[in-house]
């Protein structure tokens, strides 16, 4: 007869009808009983030929691709002028007095952040924008390109101008001022940032001030001439609108106007008269930010031509005959002035050598499940988390549930602050730019790459004979619709661009570490500035707590002004006032303890409704199920041990079959959730100890002992002794000398025993007592006549490394008082 759910609960001692604990509980450690129960519940699944289930409700395998939904009406969010003050340490010290060593160390990490991977993998520009929406390729391209443009305008991205120069918008930092272009600034400026040069400045004078200089260019030219085939061109990059830098490129480029037969003559002309006043032909290359200067003798036929040769793919349609009713020339001829092919930033700096490549692709998704009107940029820098380019990210403290409850479970009134674009507050050093590159290859190459019928190949790109290969009804209709949204920016966005991050991106493992250090140090400063307030943060979630609503509002105003003075942007529309029950990190935290938020409880109920029985479920789907159930496991009777069969199947990468009894057991567990309470300090007067053959207790001055029917592993015996101590004394603070029992997870014990012990020892705190000082050591060895001196160890609840509470150093007396009315507390409130 299969084991029913009521019988199984009775076996686990979860009902009132259980017999004496000293007799019943050791049976649960028996290996044979655990094996028989597992077989009866079908928990040890042999290899079966039944097809696996790969989808349970909304849960799919971790590695299965869900179909993303594109919204053509996505709104690109606007970013404020985010500029975190560089002297943030001085500003904090003016506000609160001397900072602690830890606070200074954390703040120095982020001004400016460094990121130096070993060997990044560079990808072609074609992979800059991921084709996540095959039905909306062009629309997604322009929306993503517009998002990148907004980030660049907001000072969050650098724009690669040349191999060794970049431009950006916004306020410069001091380390950017030191990286000015060349030894001497082009214009006299105190900041040393290269401004836009005056119109009409000759190319010669600009080249003299180039960091490479004339001689180095000639040396490079002479060296590169040896062993190279094809033409060598003097390429002058536009670092500002009128200032140039000379570099050389070999024959591998795709835009070689000079024919092979004239390459020798062209090389000698460049070499002999590289910087003399010759007629030049300016031509924008496909990268959209380079100008190629071809030196041509004045008497040549080419110099007699009228006007420059148009290389802009977009503008070439103006001079071509329409190929059909859907030819792009109809669109291009709508405007006379399509604007520049490229834009330049307000400031220009030198950067390490940066290729015209990307290190990660980008695409757009909904901002969050509750906001589908706005888009969010997803950056895929996963190469830094896997393979040969993997980077070991620094670890940081994540608050566990008990520490969080100990710290925040109180009768305070709460509100939470929303930091606008929190990651984009933290600046990156320009030396990290070559490793964090995003961009696009331009519309023509992007469409050509995705079109299976396109005849465009690299060396033909942009020439007149294949110009109309792009023309199609779908492209024409898409561009006409986008023209209403972006106007003449369609031309700008159709050009290639390479961008590097100036602020930390979300797709790199270094970013959450830096953000956690930043917000935790800021909250530490706020806590010391306002002793009657509790400020706490995890990543970009900041919460403030105070005794009364009036006090909280006053502190909120002062803290907001302080954060704004540091350059931290808050979104006042998203400030939430929670009353006395704080919603934080998926929990509801009040004076009674912590519970999961309601939306998580609803997800669990939906999961059990759709959970199939007697059908093998893919272990990757089981990972998703365990992720949800594991979040709420501390609030159930049996906790994590109840999920151990699922953990075992995931570890073995085998399918798992839910038996009706096991599913009913889990469902009963999650129907009633018990709050995790705040631990209270107290005196430990109950001690437990065990040997493989017996157990002993010391309850005050009373001593007890007992023996096991058969020898048990020492950890199992120690756990049984702790359960007996809790059952006999009712004490919620127990002393033990076993480190495994001190752990709140009982997943390493026999399955049935772990489930029962989790319920018996719920809300029990443990104090470590060395064996030599443990009063229960003698009874466990059968010596009741010997009495050791009774210890009085004090239990102090831990808040882990997450509270980061620092006692305030002496504050200068001239600082004004922070709270100008009678404080609601007689003494400064401190975390427990």
From Swiss-Prot:
Swiss-Prot/TrEMBL GO biological process terms: DNA replication; symbiont-mediated suppression of host innate immune response
Reverse transcriptase domain: residues covered: 346-589
Activity regulation, free text: Activated by host HSP70 and HSP40 in vitro to be able to bind the epsilon loop of the pgRNA. Because deletion of the RNase H region renders the protein partly chaperone-independent, the chaperones may be needed indirectly to relieve occlusion of the RNA-binding site by this domain. Inhibited by several reverse-transcriptase inhibitors: Lamivudine, Adefovir and Entecavir.
Catalytic activity: DNA(n) + a 2'-deoxyribonucleoside 5'-triphosphate = DNA(n+1) + diphosphate; Endonucleolytic cleavage to 5'-phosphomonoester
GO molecular function, one term: DNA binding
Region described as Spacer: 178-335
Sequence segments annotated as region (Terminal protein domain (TP)): 1-177
Binding site for Mg(2+): 418, 540-541
PROSITE patterns: RT_POL
Region span, Disordered: 208-241
Site keyed Priming of reverse-transcription by covalently linking the first nucleotide of the (-)DNA: positions: 63
Record EC number: 2.7.7.7, 2.7.7.49, 3.1.26.4
Span list, region Polymerase/reverse transcriptase domain (RT): 336-679
Compositional bias ranges of the Low complexity kind: 208-224
Note: Hepadnaviral virions contain probably just one P protein molecule per particle.
Described function: Multifunctional enzyme that converts the viral RNA genome into dsDNA in viral cytoplasmic capsids. This enzyme displays a DNA polymerase activity that can copy either DNA or RNA templates, and a ribonuclease H (RNase H) activity that cleaves the RNA strand of RNA-DNA heteroduplexes in a partially processive 3'- to 5'-endonucleasic mode. Neo-synthesized pregenomic RNA (pgRNA) are encapsidated together with the P protein, and reverse-transcribed inside the nucleocapsid.
The name this protein goes by in its record: Protein P
